[in-house]
């Protein structure tokens, strides 16, 4: 899913690796938050896992396919069932290779009458090509996208389920499922790797906002179910929304999930939050894993491979992210 600002990212990784080793112990004692009591309902990791598996049961959600369209209908039906007001944003978007993509952004609104709103988002399409697979014979095969796609939507669906059954949340929440995120230029192509070839649905959403729409801030959930995932603080997020980064990472530590959210910087990522920040003007962070020691990819060993399947989805990771987001929402004033 994402493209990395490759040269800059490589430099950042080296700098971070060196600096974090030298300052880790002193930084921890200075910034470690106190423990706080849980607020809000319990996030059910088994339910989120089932939502992830259901999306995968349709097959890879590739653009312009029946599996993609059927999964989209199912996602909308789930949000409607939880009492959300659901709208779609349909568009024909031109891909890097000239292919016209039938894109559908799905927007589900909890308590749409409220003006104080938090934006949660994830992409729901899956990558057409396993172009980072260690076996080159798999490079043109589709990716299931259990983590890279389904996991973020699964967490949002479980959040929608638990807040819809609870009457104490007094803010509005917008759940946006972005389409056409993962159709960026493949590594095997001779075409230049344009950053704009990624996050097409999010770009369209950001450029076609309803008049007067505002959100206090946004959180992008990307690849939030993987085994061994750790969510470092992404650089674009810190540039545009450092206060939100601090809030989320501090909250995770306060409720016992600090090991999943290290107080350390990760790379600079091209992802759906970039147009949300730059085009929509909504401060938005990206919760995305960073594997500094993974040779296959800093996004983890299954990223853009045929192994991005349910076998590598971890309920504990879903729980850490989901319960942190419950705490964030129910701590808003």
List the predicted regions and their residue ranges:
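Extracytoplasmic/secreted proteins, especially bacterial periplasmic and envelope-associated proteins
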Residues: 47-57, 70, 74-81, 151-158, ...
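N-terminal capping segment at the start of a domain
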Residues: 25-71, 82, 295-312
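Solvent-exposed loop/turn segments at secondary-structure junctions
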Residues: 62-63, 92-95, 113-114, 124-128, ...
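A non-catalytic alpha/beta surface segment that caps or lines the substrate-entry region
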Residues: 53-113
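Acidic/histidine-rich catalytic neighborhood of metal-dependent amide-processing enzymes
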Residues: 140-243, 268, 272
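Active-site-adjacent substrate-binding region
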Residues: 90, 217, 224-333
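Bacterial Sec-dependent N-terminal signal peptides
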Residues: 1-36
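Second-shell loop/turn segments in exported
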Residues: 34-42, 57-66, 93-96, 138-150, ...
């Amino acid at each position: 899913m994402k493209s990395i600002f490759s040269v800059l990212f490589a430099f950042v990784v080296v700098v971070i690796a060196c600096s974090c080793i030298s300052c880790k112990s002193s930084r921890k004692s200075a910034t470690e938050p106190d423990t706080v009591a849980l607020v809000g309902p319990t996030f059910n990791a088994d339910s989120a896992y089932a939502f992830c598996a259901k999306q995968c049961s349709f097959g890879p959600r590739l653009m312009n396919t029946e599996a993609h369209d059927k999964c989209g209908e199912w996602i909308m039906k789930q949000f409607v069932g939880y009492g959300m007001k659901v709208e779609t944003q349909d568009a024909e978007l031109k891909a890097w290779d000239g292919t016209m993509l039938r894109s559908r952004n799905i927007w589900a609104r909890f308590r749409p009458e409220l003006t104080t709103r938090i934006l949660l988002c994830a992409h729901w399409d899956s990558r057409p090509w396993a172009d980072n697979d260690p076996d080159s014979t798999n490079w043109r095969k589709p990716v299931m996208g259990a983590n890279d796609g389904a996991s973020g939507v699964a967490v949002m669906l479980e959040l929608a389920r638990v807040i819809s059954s609870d009457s104490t949340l007094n803010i509005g929440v917008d759940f946006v499922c972005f389409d056409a995120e993962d159709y960026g230029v493949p590594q095997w192509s001779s075409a230049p790797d344009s950053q704009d070839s990624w996050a097409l649905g999010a770009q369209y959403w950001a450029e076609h906002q309803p008049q007067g729409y505002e959100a206090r801030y946004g959180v992008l959930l990307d690849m939030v179910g993987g085994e061994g995932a750790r969510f470092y603080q992404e650089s674009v997020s810190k540039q545009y929304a450092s206060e939100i980064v601090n809030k989320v990472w501090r909250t995770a530590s306060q409720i016992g999930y600090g090991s999943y959210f290290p107080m350390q910087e990760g790379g600079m990522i091209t992802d759906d939050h970039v147009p949300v920040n730059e085009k929509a003007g909504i401060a938005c962070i990206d919760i995305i894993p960073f594997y500094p020691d993974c040779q296959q990819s800093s996004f983890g060993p299954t990223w853009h491979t045929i192994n991005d399947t349910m076998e590598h989805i971890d309920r504990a990771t879903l729980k850490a992210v989901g319960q942190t987001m419950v705490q964030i929402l129910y701590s808003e004033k």
